Each structure stands twice: as structure tokens, then as C-alpha cells.
Regions:
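Small cysteine-rich, disulfide-bonded extracellular modules of the LU/uPAR three-finger superfamily
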Residues: 1-82, 87-136
């Protein structure tokens, strides 16, 4: 299956709407296998808030976030991953890796977060890939 540009952008924009007024929480510890698994022993260090709308309209299946509200660290942690939620702050949407290397989904100058530190997001974007897998 190869989606048209209009179908790809409609898919991306539908996903983007789920983030409106949502949250991005930064945690320490082991990242769960997927966003369908509950947070258990991981410690929350900081929460950022998505705007409403959270993203600009998709272009070529690429979503670029509008400004997020900067979070202030509440607990000292070594951040390892983040989870994004809908506006209810209950419904998980996506988990992201956090690190100092380009291989991380979220790149930070340091993963050591201390109380009072402000955590901004300078840019947040991702691409909805045009699925080309085999049909069975």
C-alpha cells in the first residue's frame, strides 16, 4: 500500500490532534516495552505541556510541534526516556528515548536533572512514514 500525499497528511494531522493540550513527562529508569505499558518504578522528574494545537499542519507527513511550555524539574533524576500523553494526562500516546547522543529521540545537553532546572524544547518533530510493508 502506498498512501497519497493527502491521505498521509490526513493520517499525520489526526495523530497530531491527539497531542493537543497534552503532556510530555521525563522519567528515569527502564523504558517500558511500549506506551501501552504502565509506568511502574520509574521516577517522574519534569513535565512539559503541549500547546493547543500541539502541532502545525503536517507537510509531507512531517509533524512539527508548536512551542511547548517549559517544565521545571521537581525531582533529581538521570532522565532516560519520556512519555507523551493526551490532555487527560492518562492516555499514553508515544514513548521516546532521551540522551545526549544523536541516536536518542530527544537530545539534551545533559541527562542529569536537578530540582529547579528549566527544561525547554527547542524543536520537536517527527515523520509519519508512508507504509510500504507486505500484505499477507
Amino acid at each position: 500500500m502506498k498512501l497519497s500525499k493527502i491521505a498521509l497528511e490526513a493520517e499525520a494531522n489526526a495523530l497530531a490532534a491527539l497531542f493537543n493540550g497534552g503532556f510530555m513527562d521525563y522519567f528515569d529508569g527502564t523504558q517500558p516495552p511500549s506506551a501501552d505499558f504502565s509506568v511502574s518504578t520509574q521516577t517522574l522528574g519534569v513535565t512539559l505541556v503541549f500547546g493547543n494545537p500541539a502541532f502545525k499542519p503536517a507537510v509531507g507527513g512531517v509533524l512539527t510541534a508548536n512551542a511547548l511550555i517549559t517544565g521545571v524539574v521537581t525531582r533529581e533524576i538521570k532522565v532516560a526516556w519520556a512519555r507523551c500523553y493526551k490532555a487527560d494526562h492518562q492516555t499514553a500516546l508515544v514513548d521516546l528515548t532521551v540522551g545526549v547522543a544523536d541516536s536518542a529521540d530527544i537530545i539534551m545537553p545533559t541527562t542529569h536533572l536537578v530540582p529547579g532546572l528549566q527544561v525547554p524544547v527547542s524543536r520537536f518533530s517527527f515523520s509519519i512514514q508512508n507504509w510500504k510493508g507486505p500484505l499477507t
